[in-house]
Every structure is written in C-alpha cells, then in structure tokens.
Regions:
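Structural preference for solvent-exposed beta-strand-turn elements
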Residues: 1-393
C-alpha cells in the first residue's frame, strides 16, 4: 500500500529522482564552466536538469560554449541515481551549485512539482527553489558526426597546455584570441600567437573521417575550460567532431561544445626562421629558474626584461632596475655552437614557454639580436616555442 502511495506521489510530480551527492556535485562543477552571469538570455544563467531512462543530464550554456554532463543510473555496478518520474527543469546556477556543495548527506532527492518548484532534500536539510520552464532553454548546437577524429585525453590536455598560453589577451585581432587547429590526413597542427610569441604543437590523430585539410580557430577561453574538465585517465579517447562554426569534444559522460572564431588565421610559418647563427642546449629547469631569479628585479621594469649572453658554453643571465639594483648569474650550457649571443627578452614570455616543455633539455636557436628566439625540446620536433626579443643592447 505504501509503495502504491509513493508511486502516486511520484506520478503527480513533473520530475522526481534520487542521486548521489558526489556525482551531482561533480556534474554541476563541470557545467558551471559554461554558465555566465552576463547574458542577454536570462534562462542561460541557470542549469538545466533532465532526468530520464539514461540518467540525469545537466546542461550549462552561454554564447561561446555549452557543456552537458550525464550521470548514468549505474556505473561499474554502482548505483548513481534512481529516476522515479522523468522530466526537466532549469534551476538558478549559482545558488544550486553552492547548495549542492553544502548538502549534508551522501544522497540527494529532487522533486519538481507542476508549479516548477524544486524540493531538494538531503539528510535533514530541505530547499525549495523556484525553477524556470525547461522548454524555454535554447537547444544545443547540432554537429554533423561525419567530420570527426579521435585523440588520447592526455595528449589533448598537453596540446592545450602547450599552446593556449600564447593566445592574445586583447580583442584587437579577435582571431588571435584562439588556437588555430590545422587537421590533415593523420595529423593535427595547433598554433597560437599574440604577435610577440608563438607556440606550435603537432600530433598524430586517429580515425580521421575527412581526408581534406581543415583549419579552424577555437577560442582560447573555451580550451582553458576544457582542460580543467579533462581528468588524468590518459588511456581514454576523446572524439572530436567539427562543423562550420562549432566543435564538439566527447569523452566519458561529457559533451563539450564550443563555437569557432570567425576570420582567417595568419600564416605563421613565415614567422619561423629556418636557419640560425647560434644554438645551444641547456638544462630546461636550470634556465627556467635562472630567469625566474633574474625576474625578481626585472618585474620592476615595464617589459620585465632579462638579458642573456652566451659564448662557448658560458651563459650569463642578468637584469637590473634603476631603483633596486642588478642581478646576474652564470652557468654552463651542455652544447654551444655559432656566434656569441647578446639578447634581451621578456622573462614572463620565456618562462611561459620553458614551463610548458616537459623535456629535461631544450635546444635554443638564435638568429640575431632582434630576430625570433626558437625553443625546442631536445629530441622532439613536434613542439616549437618562439619568443620575440626586446631591444636593449
């Protein structure tokens, strides 16, 4: 009799389910990355919840990106959720996110009545939130699955980490706020530049369903949020689907949509010199920390300038401030060939590049005092970093 009464109660509701708090909190955290407080569409300040036979799906969206996170009913023989009455609702994102994080018990019950009021209970706590009509929530982009390829999760995370830092922080040239992806048969080349530095990463890809060369520019802000969501399960593949104005990343229980930037990305190949007057091989960490120490004084300068002198394996890193003084230190390069080097550069730009190279040693190419500095990991031709010097000598 009690079971019949419960069934009648659930049937009178627009949506009813129980869900594990940790799974709900994780999904909310993911979709919140796509929710913006500044939007011309008020309903997009909320999170859409949809309960059905495949579990609970949460959606967050703004003008640039949309994220769907699904909590399956069961996963690896563990029960995540039970849906008593399928349905959907849109709840205020900030309040719902804070509330879920602070709920006291391991399980959460969500019931939505026909007035779109959501009763959320956990332990002895009960919240009643006014929801919004889910039918008013915009549909997510439709991306044709024909144009797609796959890449390992850990590799995708590395690509983002090693390129997105070099995108432009200003909207003067909007296309430079994104990373240019050039997809060819079996390979992907990713390039970012803000006109003062450049990063380029090439990788092999799998299951490329389009043999034609494709070029698309993904907003740096979208890739930064994607990197935060990707976990460290490197063996899992990410399916990447492209259209004329959208890109979709699918992995695990996540679907991550991003709009693409309009405009033609500049041809960066002409910025990369093919010859050099000098080159050296140094310990990556040693050079990084030497520049870091020199930057303590360089930070007082508007351009954060550090000077490098190199001749016959003798390396000197220095900087100075009229108010504070001068710092310099010396160390030995593993290899050095070519003309003596005297060059200045932004400490931040050089550290940004070196800090994203995982190799123990880097090979640095010098072309001239005002020509680009090229940095590559020793033994890896798939990564190239470029930093423009600053005129001081």
């Amino acid at each position: 009799m009690q079971e019949t009464q419960n069934e009648n109660n659930h049937s009178a509701l627009k949506m009813s389910l129980n869900v594990q708090k940790d799974k709900l909190a994780e999904a909310v955290n993911h979709v919140m990355k796509a929710v913006s407080a500044k939007t011309t569409i008020p309903i997009l300040t909320g999170i859409k919840l949809t309960a059905g036979s495949d579990g609970l799906v949460l959606t967050g969206s703004n003008s640039d990106l949309s994220i769907k996170a699904r909590i399956p009913l069961t996963e690896e023989d563990e029960e995540n959720a039970v849906v008593h009455a399928p349905g959907s609702i849109v709840l205020p994102s900030r309040l719902f996110s804070e509330m879920v994080r602070k709920l006291p018990a391991a399980e959460v019950a969500i019931e939505v009545d026909t007035r779109l009021i959501a009763k959320i209970t956990s332990g002895q706590s009960e919240f009643n939130l006014n929801g919004l009509d889910p039918d008013e929530y915009p549909n997510l982009p439709v991306v044709d699955e024909k144009d797609a390829f796959s890449i390992r999760k850990d590799l995708l995370k590395d690509i983002i980490r090693q390129t997105v830092y070099a995108v432009s922080a200003t909207e003067t040239r909007p296309v430079l706020t994104g990373v240019n992806w050039i997809l060819k048969a079996g390979s992907l080349e990713c390039v970012a530049t803000d006109s003062h530095r450049l990063s380029q990463r090439s990788v092999n890809v799998e299951n490329n369903r389009n043999e034609e060369t494709r070029a698309l520019v993904i907003p740096g802000a979208s890739l930064t949020e994607l990197e935060k969501i990707i976990d460290d399960d490197g063996d899992q593949m990410v399916d990447i689907v492209m259209s004329s104005n959208q890109i979709l990343f699918k992995f695990g229980n996540i679907q991550f949509y991003s709009r693409l930037l309009d405009g033609k990305y500049p041809d960066t190949s002409r910025l990369i010199p093919t010859d050099s007057k000098s080159e050296m091989v140094v310990d990556t960490a040693q050079l990084y920390h030497s520049i870091d120490r020199a930057s303590l004084l360089a930070r007082e300068d508007r351009n954060n300038v550090v000077k490098l002198r190199a001749d016959n394996k003798n390396i000197e890193i220095s900087s100075q401030s009229l108010e504070l003084g001068r710092v310099f230190e010396t160390f030995q390069a593993d290899e050095f060939t070519g003309d003596p080097v005297r060059i200045s550069f932004s400490a931040k730009f050089m550290m940004d590049a070196l800090g994203r190279i995982d190799a123990e040693r880097v090979r640095i190419y010098f072309i001239g005092p005002m020509r680009p500095i090229i940095i590559r990991p020793v033994g890896d031709q798939q990564i190239l970093m470029l930093v423009l010097p600053i005129r001081t000598f």
